Each structure stands twice: as C-alpha cells, then as structure tokens.
C-alpha cells in the first residue's frame, strides 16, 4: 500500500468493505478480528484516494444502507459523489425501499461541503457509469483505462465511446465470482451459479 490511489471495481457491499478497510484508523479496528500484521500495513498505508467504479448508475447499486452509511462516519475519510451522476430525485420514489435509502446516502455524500472534506486525509470517490477496459503499466499497475457508459431504455449499460484513464497503483476487483459446476447438480451457466430457489437446489440439497 505504498501508492496514493487505489481503484475498486464493483458497486456492491464487498467494494464498500474494501474501501472501509483501506480507510480506517487503527483505533477503528478495535474489537475486530483483523490480524496485527495486516493492521501494521494499513496503519502505514500511503493511500489518499480510493475510487469505486460502477458501470451503471446510483439507482442500480447493490449496496445496502447500513454499510453505505458507515462511510460518513469514518475518522479520516470522506465519501465523494458527483451530483451530475445522480438521477432526478423524483425518480427515487420508484425504487425498492432499501435501495431508495442507499441512494439517499449518496445524495447526502454529494452535499458534503468541500471545507469538511479538506480535514480528511482520504477521499472515497464514487465513479458511476464507468467500466474498466484495461489495466496498464510497465511491470506493475500504473493506470486503469475506463470507458464512460450510459443506460439504454432497458437499463443496460452501453458505451458512450468516451474513455479516460485513472492513475493508480492498485486495482481490486469486487464483481463477484463464478461457482464451478458439479455433475448432476442443476446449474445456471449464464449466471455462473447453482439453480436454486431461496437457496434450495433440490430436496435435501441447498446452497448459500
């Protein structure tokens, strides 16, 4: 963690977990089960900027309100959201209650005064409508090439044709994983997971 800028790819709770871990002071880890040698590395981290990339917008996040709201209470970090990325507030009424509450947090982050941000050592930046297309560098990560996205009429993410780069020293992927299939067990190949209904695959067979 000797670089200034870390990029996190993903718009779910795992991305938030990573951002929080990189941002917390040693005291904020009191009571956790994190190992001491990891705390030593985090305590001496040079990270000042954390950018969370999401290929869709604020209304499509998979971040729960509690986890998102915790970003506003970090001792040495503050979240940053571009007002221009936020949809019209009237559209929030159409959202499921949990997502609506999460979007409310994003609106609160966008309203944080710059004077308050100046007192924080770390900035957690939400970059919506942004899809990484390449990680570049000479033998190490030096930058990420990002494509600007927009939503079509079906809320699918499509490219605008614009691109830009973010200088960084680390990229962390938080976009989920694909479960390997098992012979004889129903599997959804398009989604990379076992076919299930509320965790039940077959009578007597469950997944978590």
Residue ranges and their predicted role:
Residues 2-12:
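Beta1/beta-strand and adjacent pyrophosphate-binding region of the FAD-binding site
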Residues 1, 135, 140, 152-208:
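FAD-site-proximal beta/loop scaffold in flavoenzymes
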Residues 5, 126, 169-170:
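Short SAM/SAH-binding signature in class I
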Residues 12-14, 56, 178:
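Gly/Ser/Thr-rich beta-alpha loop segments that engage phosphate groups in nucleotides
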Residues 16, 20-162, 196-197:
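Dinucleotide-binding/catalytic capping subdomain of oxidoreductase cores
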């Amino acid at each position: 963690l000797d670089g200034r800028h870390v990029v996190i790819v993903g718009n779910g709770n795992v991305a938030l977990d990573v951002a929080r871990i990189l941002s917390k002071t040693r005291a904020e880890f009191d009571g956790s089960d994190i190992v001491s040698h990891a705390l030593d590395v985090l305590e001496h981290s040079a990270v000042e900027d954390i950018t969370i990339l999401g290929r869709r917008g604020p209304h499509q996040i998979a971040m729960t309100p509690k986890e998102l709201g915790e970003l506003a209470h970090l001792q040495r970090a503050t979240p940053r959201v571009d007002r221009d990325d936020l949809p019209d507030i009237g559209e929030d009424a159409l959202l499921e209650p949990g997502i609506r509450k999460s979007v409310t947090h994003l609106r609160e982050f966008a309203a944080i005064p710059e004077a308050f941000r100046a007192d924080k050592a770390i900035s957690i930046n939400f970059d919506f409508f942004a899809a990484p297309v390449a990680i570049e560098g000479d033998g190490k990560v030096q930058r990420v090439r990002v494509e600007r996205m927009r939503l079509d009429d079906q809320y699918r993410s499509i490219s605008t044709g614009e691109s830009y780069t973010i200088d960084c020293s680390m990229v962390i992927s938080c976009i989920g994983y694909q479960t390997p299939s098992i012979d004889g067990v129903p599997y959804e190949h398009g989604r990379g997971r076992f076919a299930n209904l509320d965790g039940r695959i077959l009578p007597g067979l469950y997944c978590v």
